[in-house]
């Protein structure tokens, strides 16, 4: 007898993998669709957009990818501005270099820009700083280069930024902002197989029709949300994801609604979660060099959340996902909460086996709980089980709670290095004030000897190769037949209050993520080509691509 469930899964996986590869037929379909696209006219974009934009240098010229790109293009038209921009790029290259190569780069930079500036003087330095640099010894030069960097950034924020606002490059930025704010609905995407499910709905793979970019779409059932009073939690997750822009945390790209669902479109992580890699590939556990690499990236992600006054509360390997290249990101911020002065957090939240003693004993808690869960996760990646569960027998929830509160961690697995034992002990300290990351205001876990092989500047710049790369021909997700369907929610009706909530949630494209997608997929260069002409017709029709026709 034909296994229809297996056939359905095969078809869904084939379509999904084909979309990820961008076959020749898909490329032709994409090119055809892009020909119909064009930017809004300059007059329209100026009128509708200019008044809504806050003229903030950091936001426009640094954080927003298209703003940054157009600002750099503008700087290239004025020799003095171009010189400053090139100098800052050279400083950035020097900061990210290692060993003797870094020393050589510094000597080259000093000679080229300070000692014998054949390409022109850096006038923004001022007489005092220029004099100090000219008289400085080599040992003092790194500090002076950083002062020169600060002076260069301050210079670009002044006259160059003002001139940029009166240039055609800024007009083009406004056109892109108008394009960015186009309405987003389900016709903007192709939908593929289900990847999993959560408390309020399912997660599926989707593809943007105009760019070919793949994402994961978290679909929250409107009726289920209302029935379970989950609206506030869903909106909080969305608002937190909007604020977060880190290579170590999943990014939110779009928020839109359908008739039945609220949809969060986020980074698609094809490599599976760390729980899968701990328990389903070879012997339980992960080799130590991978543990160090993932832990370093996780630390960066947690520190980014804390810098935004956000408490994660659900750190565990299951919520750490790998991308195509083997880099990891934190996911599922459904339990995350904003930390507010004078408002203690006491609600029990998290996953059994990862919750800190202060959560389990119902006292006030804050950022240290994330570091406790980090210690549990490092231990689990190495040992193949969490620190307060007996791997040889079933441990009750109450026993895990007792051990977490009372027992010291024991290291029986032979793979634990001394550095690994030490960082786990420090993260798993019972008292939050004794916990690594929380002992002082500047207690940075990245400085621990466990991470001695990691250059964090290069890691954050994406310049460190992951020790493991997922197989691109594998779908790291359950078979679609193993993902249970949701039952229909009955007896729920929507009113004006619900409609207002849906509108507040469905805000469309998220600027930084959307702009990155536009640049990475080549659409920015295509639509900026002065010789290009759009053929008209709009770009979001409901036609299915060849990839999707077998679904």
Swiss-Prot record:
Lipid attachment residues per UniProt (S-geranylgeranyl cysteine): 548
Catalytic activity: L-threonyl-[rhodopsin] + ATP = O-phospho-L-threonyl-[rhodopsin] + ADP + H(+); L-seryl-[rhodopsin] + ATP = O-phospho-L-seryl-[rhodopsin] + ADP + H(+)
Domain of life: Eukaryota
Membrane topology: Lipid-anchor
UniProt xrefs under Pfam families: Pkinase (PF00069), RGS (PF00615)
Post-translational modification as stated in the protein's UniProt record: Autophosphorylated in vitro at Ser-487. Phosphorylation at Ser-36 is regulated by light and activated by cAMP.
Protein species of origin: Xenopus laevis (African clawed frog)
PANTHER family named among the record's database cross-references: G PROTEIN-COUPLED RECEPTOR KINASE/RIBOSOMAL PROTEIN S6 KINASE, RHODOPSIN KINASE GRK7
Protein name: Rhodopsin kinase grk7-a
